[in-house]
Amino acid sequence: MSSIPEGLKYSAEHEWIAEAGAAGTVRVGITDFAQDALGDVVYVDLPEVGTEVTAGTAVGEVESTKSVSDIYAPVSGTVAAVNDELDGEPGLVNSAPYEGGWLFEITLADEAQLEGLMDAEGYASHTS
């Protein structure tokens, strides 16, 4: 059974979204369900800081021993930060998907777009 923390938002593409330190900025990662399906992550390709992203579009890739999967922007905005730790340790996506394995942060174009994402209960239904 995969972990689905309360207090986060979730996309249908298996990304989680959490409020980051700065107002109007969110942190994004892939869910425990997604990392489990991928298998051992060996490489992560992330968008560059400053890149404008649109919700639902591919912005990077996660490569595992099983496959290569797109990472989708769950919200629209500007990439504010990326997790450089993943360059040397991509397995953090597997071992700590909600902590050290986060992918990038986005400064939101509009905070109202968070309302269209799932809560933990909705995501649990989506993955069952």
Swiss-Prot record:
Q: Which cofactor does it need?
A: (R)-lipoate
Recorded hits in CDD domains, A to Z, give: GCS_H
Q: Which residues carry this modification: N6-lipoyllysine?
A: 66
Which Gene3D superfamilies does this chain map to? 2.40.50.100
This protein's assembly is summarised as: The glycine cleavage system is composed of four proteins: P, T, L and H.
Family of this protein: Belongs to the GcvH family.
What name does the UniProt record give this protein?
Glycine cleavage system H protein
> Can you name the source organism?
Micrococcus luteus (strain ATCC 4698 / DSM 20030 / JCM 1464 / CCM 169 / CCUG 5858 / IAM 1056 / NBRC 3333 / NCIMB 9278 / NCTC 2665 / VKM Ac-2230)
